[in-house]
Amino acid sequence: MKKILLSALAVIISVSLLGQEQKNEIVKKGINLGPLPAIAFDADKGFQAGALLNIYDFGDGATYPNPYSQWYMEASFFTKGSQLYVLTYDTKSLIPGVRFSPGVVLINDKALDFYGFNGYQSFYDHERVAQGKNDPQSYLYSPYYKTARTHLIAKADFTGEIIKDKFYWEAGYMFNWFKQGAIDRAKVNKGKEPEKMFPDDVPTLYEQYRQWGIISDEEDGGGFNSGFKLGLMYDTRDVENSPNKGLWIEGHAILAPKWLGTTNPYYRYCLTFRHYVPIVMKKLTLAYRLNYQGTIGNNAPFYVLPFYSMFGSSYDRDGMGGYRTVRGMMRNRVQALDVAFYNAELRWKFVDFQLFKQNIAFSLTAFSDGAISVRPYDMSFKKQLTDFSSPALYNAALKEYQDYMSKGITYDKKHFDQLHATVGAGLRFIMNQNFIVAFEYGKPLNKQDGNGAFYINTGYLF
């Protein structure tokens, strides 16, 4: 971490000496490219290697710093078999008066995080995980909290004006295919010493949820989602990808009925309030985001719960936890029928200049993120005696379930999940107010949410 921060500081100093203090920002025209290598490591997925590319079309420059259209492409590979492919497009000119944002994403994850439902009601044994990493004689326990998932996303979003430059309608179609199940132990154990391999006779949490009936037979394995999204948006941001002031408020419903091809139908909604408060204009900004995602009715398939639903140039992301939602918290730590999360951060653009005919800036960020389960997913033991080959196996499974549940928070009408909070800081490289490379570190306040995480990614969260 220290080496990374020192290297980043050296880059800032060197480019500041080369560059000129910015007086009049260069208005960009035509096509601008933003390539970036994607390199990371995960103990269960292995090394990540890949690349991403942002393409911005500013046309004649009339709308700069907001582009007429933009492409985002990414391909990443992990040494133990996981892959990520992303292709999204966002244009304001293809359809007159309508913003069109299609995208296709394929994620093949051999070791996806799975910590159960309802936040702290699902106990995370961080001591056992640490023992598996630090004790040479103990097997790695982290695969216990993993599942395998292949996820295909195809979407097409449309946005049009109701009141010029302020109020908009939103509509979209989404198609998702989920294939989810237990991990492939051979792939997860690949390259590990025999004593560190996750044993075949130890069930993962996902496998236990199946045995206890928390994840039903109908939902096990995944399914198809086909549905519409309908919503409204109020947007007064001065710059879309790097705002200094304004409001950005959205509310939309997700409708995935059976007759449209959805395997396990559901209906959900998402409300998001974002506010950008200029303290020193174009230098220091207080930005915060409040989100509430709920389920209409009392049920939704477990595999749709982790996602933060979005319109526009991006696509639905795993949450809550991770770079796009709650930085520093383990990915998918908070899943429930209804969840809420917040982000609050100070953004200080401490230097800006022009270099090689590009507008360059560096920004420091201090932040706090958090999430909470508001309405719980049903975690009751649903199996019957007839589901087991003997009463002894039934009793053993029931006792195992009771022991597991006794370690977490017990839900009742007045006692919901506690806040999962993190704090952290980051540095961003900003080119032409659109291509943004972020270096951030987040630390949870509770070890039940992990030990913290360092991210190298693109853009602002919001």
Regions found by a protein language model. Give the residues of each.
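Transmembrane beta-barrel strands of outer-membrane/channel proteins
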Residues: 39-41, 51-55, 71-77, 102-110, ...
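C-terminal outer-membrane beta-barrel translocator/porin domains of Gram-negative envelope proteins
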Residues: 228, 239-356, 376, 395-396
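Surface-exposed extracellular loop regions of Gram-negative outer-membrane beta-barrel proteins
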Residues: 51-73, 229-272, 424-430, 435-440
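Gram-negative/organellar outer-membrane beta-barrel architecture
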Residues: 25-33, 41-224, 320-324, 448-462
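Outer-membrane beta-barrel translocator domains and adjoining extracellular loop/strand segments
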Residues: 65-66, 84-87, 112-120, 181-188, ...
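Short loop/turn motifs that connect adjacent beta-strands in outer-membrane beta-barrel proteins
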Residues: 20-31, 59-68, 94-99, 163-169, ...
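Hydrophobic, lipid-facing positions within transmembrane beta-strands of outer-membrane proteins
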Residues: 33-35, 49-51, 83-87, 150-156, ...
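Predominantly the C-terminal beta-signal and adjacent terminal strand-loop region
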Residues: 290, 430-462
